[in-house]
Amino acid sequence: MTRNVRALVAAAVMFATGTAVADCWQAVSAKYGLPVALLKAIAEQESGFDNQAENVNRNGSRDVCMMQINSMHFAELERRFGITEQKLKADKCTCLDVGAWILYNNTQRLGPTWDAIGAYNAGSQDKRERYAWRIYPRLEKYRAAEQR
C-alpha cells in the first residue's frame, strides 16, 4: 500500500509541475506579446528544452538553462530583478521569462523581425540569418501543433 501511495504522490507532483510549466509558457507569452510557438522554437534550438544545459562559448562567456541565457546578462539580471544564475538553472519559468525578456528587448530595438530573432543568439548579421533559418522550421512545427 505504501508503495502505491508513493507512486500516486510522485505522479501528482509530476503532473502539477508539468501543468505549472505549461501555464508558464502562456503567461510569459502574454507578458511580452511573443507567440508561445516562437518561444518553444527558441528553447528547442538552444537546449532541446533542457534547463540544466550549460555551454562555454569561444569568448569565455557561458550560456545556461533552457533558453541559454548568456553570462553577460547575469549582473544586470541580479541587480534589476534579483535573478541569479542558480535561479535560472533551478526554475524553468524564470529561465523562460528571462529569455523572452531578452527577445522582447531585441524586438523593441530591431522591430518584430527575423533580425531580432537572430539577435537572440548572434551579433553579426550573417550569424543572425543562420540562426533565424534554424528557428523557422521549428516555429512552423509549433504553429502547426497549435492548430490541432
Regions found by a protein language model. Name each.
Residues D23-R148:
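Catalytic glycan-binding domains that act on GlcNAc-containing polysaccharides
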Residues A11-M14:
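Short, linear, compositionally biased motifs with a strong N-terminal bias
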Residues M1-V9:
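Bacterial N-terminal signal peptides that target proteins for export
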Residues A16-T19:
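N-terminal signal peptide c-region/cleavage motif recognized by signal peptidases
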